[in-house]
Amino acid sequence: MSNKKIFLIFYNQLLLIFGMLCLGINVIHCSAETTRKILPYKSAMINYSKPIKFSIYLPESDDQTDKYPVLYLLHGQSQDEKIWDQMGIKEIADHLISTGCISPLVIVMPREEAYMEKISESDFGNRIINELIPYVESNFPVLTDPASRAIGGISRGALWAQKIAFNHYGTFGLLGQHSLPAAVFSDYVIYRIYADSEGKIPLMKIRIDSGTEDPYLKGALAFSKQLADVKAPYMLVIEPGGHDPEYWKEHLEDYLIWYADNLKNPAND
């Protein structure tokens, strides 16, 4: 089986399974295309009762010491992390890497279980920062420099990506806003974030895109205006399409090219 695999990781807090893993016993379920591992995880800071699930794309490598830039991609409302597989992210990434169009990268796709919950009341963003990122960086071959770490999302996932990236400005080098439904922060908050970080934290690269028929196009334009008002650099792409998987699938290759081209990769220096 190719080393290019998408792993579905289940976090849990069962001491029994943790003990098995400490003894070198893995609980693994295999299929023809993917390998799924059940692994325990417990935050050192916060004890959550519900598990986090995520899929991860790992590029093929002959050198086990290789480390790669990492991209965190967040799905939209009424979806889960399987949407990325359904849109062909593995095949697209494989093709781009194998043809030399992009450098290899790791792609992490977490599931938001309570996607109907108000973002303002959800702990999902904190769990990404406090649990998921530390776990990924401890268990997978990823670079830990913020310039080598990106976050992006589609629809509600774009809202989450913006909230996480700006609440923790300096944690990510790139932010992708794909079909952003609305501006997350007030104009003043955006102004303060950039003013407070000026000269201290490298500017985050931002790509915003939306379809011409997207009913939420105004969200992308509103965020673009906020950035323009504070003279923050960004890329705005408006192309034919709506607010749906067909639009995202059509542009998924463009997304991966942008992330890979802008993520810092010492192997390319």
What are these regions (language model features)?
Residues S2-L15:
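Bacterial N-terminal signal peptides that target proteins for export
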Residues N12-N26:
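Bacterial N-terminal signal peptides
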Residues S31-D269:
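Non-catalytic cap/lid and distal C-terminal segments of serine-dependent acyl enzymes
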